Amino acid sequence: MNVNEAIAYIHSVFWKGSIPGLSRTQELLAKMGNPEKKLKFVHIAGTNGKGSTAAMTASILQQAGYTVGLYTSPYIYRFHERMQVNGVQISDEELVEVTEFVKPFADSMTESPTEFELVCGIAFEYFLRKNCDIVVLEVGMGGAFDATNVIECPEVAVITNIGLDHTDFLGNTLEEIAATKAGIFKEGGNAVVYRGTAGVEQVFETVCAEKHICLRKADFDGLRLISHGLEGQVFDCGARKQLQLPLLGVHQLKNAAVVLGIMDTLIEKGWNITEEHIREGLRLTSWPGRFDIVGRDPLFIIDGGHNPQCIEALVANIQDYLTGRKVIALTGVLADKDYGDMYKPVMPLVQEFVCITPPNPRKLEAAELAAHLTAVGAKATACQSIEEGVRTAISLAGNDGVVLCFGSLYTIGSIKEALDEQ
């Protein structure tokens, strides 16, 4: 098996889609010898901000001298991003080796695992082989019935910002979604949560009381933005002053406040993390695809925003960082997203939309998106390919303008590839 064959095998169960439930993952891991039981975790659920929160957490723990696994999804540019140890992605050789180990166990199951469940098995085995001291584990979707929730009580269970997404699986209200995500809270454990609505916080408080969990809410009241620009931002959070963060946007400060809560909890549990580790870890955090500057001439920004809360953050970033600039949106979206509402807040800030078709079975055709945007009063054009979209957007932006890509995580890798080939 070579790396392409390994990835093809992993993707071969893609047709199963998402099937909530833990039984398949538990069966697979039991056959493998339960690697997850020999690892420690920071387990992170939430609608938005999971990846950024995970990246900051892993960066700080790495600065503290620990061997840190990081498991995230989906990937932006290449599959290997989903499994990293101390910032280094799994190698081709390691991916082949671990996939070959897991394959016979998966193949022997009566009900084969989904792709996500298979990748979880591969990741747990990989992190064990790399002797990780701790793994920062991002939930795929939801919480209670997500494949990652097979783990025993983590060092900290974390819930980031909650919004209405995947309502067909998770619930129709914020409170229902919060309850599903709180399924990662284990009896007698520790939890850190993003401050939400009164109803959402009540859900967390109730679950934590029932399960004797020590609950910590992120300190948003202590947040103060000192300065910000396209290179990053400087902020205070409570007693911690002049912290530097390269991730852009006020919403990232709230994610950082969650991370500081995680660190305070880990310190209380005996992990050796100093204030300098925290400061350096935040300063060195890297997380691609989130208001991410990937080109300078013209300014070319990629953002994975694809639901109303992400778009709210994107609008704030355009207003904070791009005021007075000509903004050309390069965008594609999945057909099952509420794209009507998604584009509405961005329209007044964008001079023209260049529409592309995402490379995904759930895609909305570029022509259909352009027709919708034109019908609601925007200037929009459809392109036949992502390459044509990149060329068109750059041409429209000119030297002084900005190309802003958003709408779907699934377009980012192809856009970056096309940009690199310009």
Predicted feature descriptions by range:
Residues 37-38, 134-137, 145-158, 162-166, ...:
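Nucleotide phosphate-binding/pyrophosphate-handling subdomain across enzymes
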Residues 194-195, 207-229, 246-250, 278-284, ...:
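Beta-strand->loop->alpha-helix junctions that form or flank phosphate-binding loops
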Residues 119-169, 201-242:
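Extended acidic/charged loop-beta regions that coordinate divalent cations
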Residues 44, 52-69:
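A conserved segment at the C-terminal end of the G1
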Residues 197-216, 231, 299-300, 308, ...:
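C-terminal helical cap/extension that packs against the catalytic core
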Residues 1-40, 168:
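Positively charged, low-complexity intrinsically disordered leader regions
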Residues 22, 26-30, 34-37, 63-152, ...:
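ATP-dependent carboxylate-amine ligase catalytic core
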